[in-house]
């Protein structure tokens, strides 16, 4: 089963990008495993994991959705080293 996870730079309780990611995750969980990871989750955001917990996969059955909203070298370096397919959602 393919896992589809989302990556955010930051995650808040009520911000628009995190809310969108939660909505997408809810739909994705109907077809398989799906979580949200962020470099900077705000305190109290318990449903988003630290990006470092996602790790790099040697499996080919994982897709990453990246919500690009601002520059963060650590996130870009993680994605650059990632062998998984990455889907970009650009937030302006």
Q: How would you name each of these model-derived features?
A:
Residues 1-58:
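N-terminal pre-catalytic "stem/leader" segment of glycosyltransferase-like enzymes
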Residues 44-92:
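Extended catalytic core of nucleotide-activated donor transferases of GT-like folds
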């Amino acid at each position: 089963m393919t896992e589809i996870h989302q990556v955010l730079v930051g995650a808040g309780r009520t911000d628009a990008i995190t809310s969108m990611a939660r909505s997408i995750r809810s739909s994705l969980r109907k077809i398989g495993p799906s979580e949200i990871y962020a470099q900077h989750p705000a305190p109290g955001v318990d449903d988003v994991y630290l990006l470092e917990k996602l790790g790099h996969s040697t499996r080919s059955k994982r897709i990453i959705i990246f919500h690009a909203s601002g520059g963060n070298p650590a996130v870009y370096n993680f994605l650059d080293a990632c062998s998984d397919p990455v889907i970009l959602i650009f937030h302006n």
